[in-house]
Amino acid sequence: MSVLLIEAFYGGSHKQLMDLLQEELKEECVLCTLPAKKWHWKARTAALYFMQTVPASANYRILFASSVLNLAELAALRPDLGKLKKVLYFHENQLAYPVQKCKERDFQCGYNQVLSCLVADTVVFNSAFNMESFLTSIGKFMKLIPDHRPKDLEKIIRPKCQVLYFPVRFPDVSRFMPEHKLAHLENVIGVKRNGDFYQREGLPGQQKSRALGGLMKNSNACRESGLCETQPGLCTTQHEGLHSPLTAAGRLNKSEASESTNPCQEEDKQHVTFNLCNIWSGMDYLQRPLHVVWPHRWEHDKDPETFFKVLLKLKEQELPFHVSVLGETFTDVPGWKRCIVAVTRCVPRPWCTRRSSQLNICILHLNSFLKGFRISARDQIL
């Protein structure tokens, strides 16, 4: 175990990166983590915790940690770890991170990241914007110090920095793709059919991705809980066993015979039949409505209010579109008023049905729309 992996906020993309590294390095690494709760407390106190819990070993050669950890503190508290080659990875930086409220920025968190960069041997950022926004903000950030300010820190840190894009392991979704796209993959990208799924030519055979299994598991749970009902133009959360447009149409015809006739439901079924057939056959591919996906967690730093302003602009111009809202939400839900406005103006039927021929909102792991209605009646006046 020559690589020591330390993650002070083991959740989300931080967890994904560490899990991938651990899977690739196998027995060559040891992983030490703290749960993804109370971010600011982890940033301030994680070094002291890891000082006591990281096992000592003469085999360590590399220390890899995210910027949540105060690397300078850990190196001072554990001299044996300070001697290692230290790699610091920035998922985000606190010098350019959006502030939720108009208040003074938490100086200590950004200051800790600057200290960590000075101690690290290599500093890695997940994007060029992340790197440049951090480096170019150091000078202005240090001016917050009343007097005796350090100088030229950017010049000291920049030579250590490089961009390494976040590694993404894509699930095998070929079973959901229309034939014309599968042909494109086969002819242009160099993937080859192998049984029920596609793989790159020349690579050894592999089982279907676990991520795909998780996707289908979440999809089934979502259908069973009633959160995702039939949505026009959205096929990724339904019809797990579909292999052709014929089976899709057959299932829909079967359901039509068994369900009570309702004008709204009949309209939805017609849209679903049309769109599913188009998806699987490739017909009218460019004519289908724009499908907008919100893949982020629902927090202030992702600016959900601007997202809803764009949706309302699309609606004002009478452009057809679908929306899929993904990701997790937390106790405080930002943009609640914009959510209510969007639902009120864009969804012509009662929200409880979660159906619309104009706007389809697929809620998988997000209930912020419903949480928005918990605001007091006075504040809900639009």
Curated annotation (Swiss-Prot):
<keyword id="KW-0963">Cytoplasm</keyword>
<dbReference type="GO" id="GO:0005737">
    <property type="term" value="C:cytoplasm"/>
</dbReference>
<dbReference type="GO" id="GO:0005634">
    <property type="term" value="C:nucleus"/>
</dbReference>
<comment type="similarity">
    <text>Belongs to the glycosyltransferase group 1 family. Glycosyltransferase 4 subfamily.</text>
</comment>
<keyword id="KW-0328">Glycosyltransferase</keyword>
<dbReference type="GO" id="GO:0016438">
    <property type="term" value="F:tRNA-queuosine(34) beta-mannosyltransferase activity"/>
</dbReference>
<dbReference type="GO" id="GO:0006400">
    <property type="term" value="P:tRNA modification"/>
</dbReference>
<keyword id="KW-0539">Nucleus</keyword>
<dbReference type="GO" id="GO:0006417">
    <property type="term" value="P:regulation of translation"/>
</dbReference>
<comment type="function">
    <text>Glycosyltransferase that specifically catalyzes mannosylation of cytoplasmic tRNA(Asp) modified with queuosine at position 34 (queuosine(34)). Mannosylates the cyclopentene moiety of queuosine(34) in tRNA(Asp) to form mannosyl-queuosine(34). Mannosylation of queuosine(34) in tRNA(Asp) is required to slow-down elongation at cognate codons, GAC and GAU, thereby regulating protein translation.</text>
</comment>
<protein>
    <recommendedName>
        <fullName>tRNA-queuosine alpha-mannosyltransferase</fullName>
        <ecNumber>2.4.1.110</ecNumber>
    </recommendedName>
</protein>
<dbReference type="InterPro" id="IPR051862">
    <property type="entry name" value="GT-like_domain_containing_1"/>
</dbReference>
<dbReference type="InterPro" id="IPR022701">
    <property type="entry name" value="QTMAN_N"/>
</dbReference>
<dbReference type="Pfam" id="PF12038">
    <property type="entry name" value="QTMAN_N"/>
</dbReference>
<keyword id="KW-0808">Transferase</keyword>
